[in-house]
Amino acid sequence: ANMQVLSTSKSGTSLNAQSVSGKGLDLRTISPDNIESMEVIRGIPSVEYGNLTSGAVIIKTRSGVTPLEVKLKADPFSKMAYAGKGFLISEKMGAMNISADYSQSYADIRKRYNGFDRITVNLGYSNTFMKSSRPLTFNMRLAYYQNINSEKTDPQLKQDEKIKNENMGVRFNLEGNWRLNTSWISSLGYSFMVNYSHQQDYRREQIILQSGITPVANSYVSGEYQTYFLSSSYYSDYTVDGKPLDVFGQLKANKLFQFSSDCFMTLKAGIEWKYNVNRGDGMMFDPKLPPVVNDIQSIRPRSFKSVPAINTLSFFIEDKAQLPIRKTTLTLQGGVRLSNLFIDKSAGRKDMFMVEPRINMEYNILNGDNNKVFDDLSIVGGFGIAAKAPTLLYLYPDK
């Protein structure tokens, strides 16, 4: 739901290097020292994962009991300070994990006004209920992040030019697994996430028109209108105010059929829902002093509140089987993912329905049990379709 751009109807160019609009999650809001594990899924992923094109990266932050850690780092491009600890409340009450960090980075040290300064505070709680019967794992994480030193200036900037970037947000995650071990279901996994932030980018810059005095159009509908002319040089003040809200929920069930120690089959089925909306004031500037002007099209102020929310509902089912063939092993995995993107009628088009079948095969020929040279030699192949839905940035462009 990040829409921090000058115009969604033109190139979608971001306001400056601070924005990741249309590019996915801003990894700068995640503390690297608070990461517990990182899984890279290459090739054709499971149908459990959707809205992607080539693989996925699964990041899990720390939880449970961890020793006290204090870290300091400095190099020409970045500075970082981190402190964190996880402690056990009690055997019944579970464990708590607390951490905080500060980070400063420059993609280009020659452009200090494009630097990034942020603080992050993380709070995590984990516990396992009903340990002796049907264990239910519960992991809750709450993160707060905020930019500091948001107002930037630099001797390289022209006189009276200013840059200001503000980003403050809260991220809540809840996930776990319930081992039911019944005749029809082995385990039930759940995941829920809410991410809300307030982003505000302000810039004052000098606009110089190479074509000299230029007419500007500011109407929202086609037709003939009286307009005005811009001078060849002027200062433009513009602000992009965004309040993106992203909600994600997933529920999946697993059933394990164990035929022998090395022969089994696992069935997986689940449902997933995503909701994306932006309630910011959007692009704000004086129409008589626009930040971008050309002979073809000019941009206009637009509130993000006028952009409808996106709802995506998905279902998936998958079967994975491992079959021993003498001293070799054949693993087959196949499934399908069905997704429907609900589009508002104002977009002038119907909902988007996506079908994503995926198949993977791995035949392990050599291993430590049948030879003394190779630890692992396998033939891997597969076929799959992955669909990535358009974001709010591109689905509802301004007129």
Would you name each region that the model predicts?
Residues F129-Y145, N165-G348:
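Face-selective signature of the C-terminal outer-membrane beta-barrel domain
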Residues S19-K23, V40-I41, V65-L68, Q104-I109, ...:
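Extracytoplasmic loops and strand-loop junctions of Gram-negative outer membrane beta-barrel proteins
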Residues A1, G24-R28, E48-L72, F87:
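N-terminal periplasmic accessory domains that precede
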Residues A74-S78, Y102-Y106, L142-I148, V194-Y202, ...:
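Transmembrane beta-strands of outer-membrane beta-barrel pores
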Residues G84, D108-G115, N147-Q159, Q200-S211, ...:
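Outer-membrane beta-barrel translocator domains and adjoining extracellular loop/strand segments
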Residues S303-K399:
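Structural signature of Gram-negative outer-membrane beta-barrels, strongest in the C-terminal barrel
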Residues N2-I41:
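Short acidic/polar hinge/loop motifs at secondary-structure boundaries
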Residues E69-Q104, K111-M193:
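Transmembrane beta-barrel wall of Gram-negative outer-membrane proteins
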